[in-house]
């Protein structure tokens, strides 16, 4: 079972709230989040309720201020435990929506879609095995989006505002 602790103030100070299940941040008294401690597994945290807004992947470790998880502000309103996956990882990315156009199958991390596949946009995705994080920019930078097994017919389905994808990586729990 995963465990994550949210703190109102930087440096793990102020009121805290422990969580071990999805979407546990519905507490009205918890108004801001400036530091996080991830004790077990990997989590995705979201700026807004119901898994919306900016998304951030956090692996086991300490995040003493929101800038450490690339946060834009101190707002975290929902979270999701990323299930452990011990098998193979596989996804198919498509250059156009509804699984049309050039298709590339990926089984490992890719720091630059441009260098590897000559792509800067991905419009649809089929995640066949494992969970993945796609990043807006190369080298795992920019906005992040969690893709779990399933079909994403257009970039809006994974919460993006455009089809720009620079890199992607498998969600692996190393602890």
UniProtKB/Swiss-Prot annotation:
UniProt keyword terms in alphabetical order: Eye lens protein, Repeat
Domain of life: Eukaryota
Start and end residues of each Beta/gamma crystallin 'Greek key' domain: 2-40, 41-83, 89-129, 130-172
GO biological process: lens development in camera-type eye; visual perception
Residues of the signal peptide: none
UniProt region (Connecting peptide), positions on chain: 84-88
A Pfam match: Crystall
GO MF annotation: an example: structural constituent of eye lens
PANTHER family per record: BETA/GAMMA CRYSTALLIN, GAMMA-CRYSTALLIN B
Free-text function comment from the UniProt entry: Crystallins are the dominant structural components of the vertebrate eye lens.
Family statement: Belongs to the beta/gamma-crystallin family.
UniProt domain comment: Has a two-domain beta-structure, folded into four very similar Greek key motifs.
Protein name: Gamma-crystallin A
Gene that encodes it: CRYGA
